[in-house]
């Protein structure tokens, strides 16, 4: 697709997400997190709204990256549908009606002046409509639906087109759960320059306030009586599942990690690929 006179807005970066929720579980499968209209059958009351800046006067095609999530099981009407409003006017298309895999669905053609315009996602059913991105473009060519094509398009429109080098490290830990934190701390205290990469904005994995699973297991017992001291540093003072968020002491884990001068922490980064030399991993590539 010719990306001249094109703008992309990722749904999860909308200035106001309204009643839409962020779904982050499928980044590796479809390329990003996305917005979900989870109203349990009741249409969402508040739209997701943002502002985009159009580079020139022109006739712009409205393209939406979405999917028909029920087409796995039925060719009938889908419950997960929504509209897109441009400057408060709903496009005639209903989105989320076609393919079972993520795809670009074409809406209408809209005359726009150079400058700022509003976009809004308006849920129609409350039954889990899905929107990843909205594109306004003067090109009549449809972008490809494959994951590689999507990533390339997003890089051209939003940057960076080539990965930003975040530095070289002796030891890279992918995953900021309990085991990842312990591995990073141990390596850092042995003198390694460490990168700890976590795909959430909180450390702890299952033992974080997001999941709320208590720590368990035997530590400080023979034949390894010293095994467990790191857990005593970062673990919550109390055990138990499904307790209040404060029970899991996310701040305690973060404080210990940030205190280590040899650790560089990357929160909110999902590793999507590795680069190898022979059988040796040389680097990891992540998206924020």
What feature does the model see in each segment?
Residues 187:
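Aromatic pocket-lining residues of Rossmann-like dinucleotide-binding sites
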Residues 1-163:
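Extracytoplasmic
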Residues 165-177:
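Beta1/beta-strand and adjacent pyrophosphate-binding region of the FAD-binding site
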Residues 192-193, 198-280:
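Conserved N-terminal/central alpha/beta ligand/cofactor-binding core
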Residues 180:
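N-terminal Rossmann-fold NAD(P) dinucleotide-binding loop
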Residues 121, 283-288:
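Short beta-strand segments that buttress and anchor functional surface loops
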Residues 168-170, 191-194:
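Residues that mark the start of a beta-strand
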Residues 35, 278-284:
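Short, hydrophobic/aromatic-rich segments at coil-to-beta transitions
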């Amino acid at each position: 697709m010719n990306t001249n006179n094109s703008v992309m807005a990722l749904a999860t970066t909308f200035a106001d997400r309204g009643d839409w929720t962020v779904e982050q579980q499928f980044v590796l499968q479809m390329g990003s997190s996305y917005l979900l209209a989870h109203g349990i059958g009741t249409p969402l009351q508040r739209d997701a709204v943002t502002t985009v800046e159009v580079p020139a006067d022109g006739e712009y095609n409205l393209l939406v990256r979405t999917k028909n999530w029920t087409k796995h099981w039925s060719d009938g009407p889908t419950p997960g549908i929504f509209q897109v409003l441009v400057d408060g006017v709903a496009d005639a298309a209903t989105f989320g009606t076609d393919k079972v895999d993520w795809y670009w669905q074409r809406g209408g053609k809209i005359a726009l002046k150079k400058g700022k315009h509003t976009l809004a996602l308006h849920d129609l059913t409350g039954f889990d409509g899905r929107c990843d991105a909205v594109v306004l473009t003067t090109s009549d060519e449809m972008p490809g639906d494959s994951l590689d094509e999507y990533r390339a398009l997003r890089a051209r429109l939003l940057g960076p087109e080539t990965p930003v080098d975040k530095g070289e490290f002796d030891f890279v830990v992918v995953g900021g759960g309990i085991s990842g934190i312990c591995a990073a701390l141990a390596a850092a205290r042995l003198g390694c320059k460490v990168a700890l990469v976590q795909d959430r904005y909180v450390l702890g994995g299952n033992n974080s306030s997001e999941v709320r699973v208590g720590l368990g297991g035997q530590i400080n017992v023979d034949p390894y009586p010293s095994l467990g001291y790191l857990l005593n540093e970062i673990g919550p003072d109390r055990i138990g599942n499904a307790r209040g968020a404060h029970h899991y002491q996310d701040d305690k884990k973060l404080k210990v990690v940030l205190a280590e001068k040899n650790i560089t922490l990357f929160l909110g980064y999902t590793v999507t690929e590795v680069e190898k030399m022979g059988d040796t991993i040389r680097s990891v590539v992540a998206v924020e």
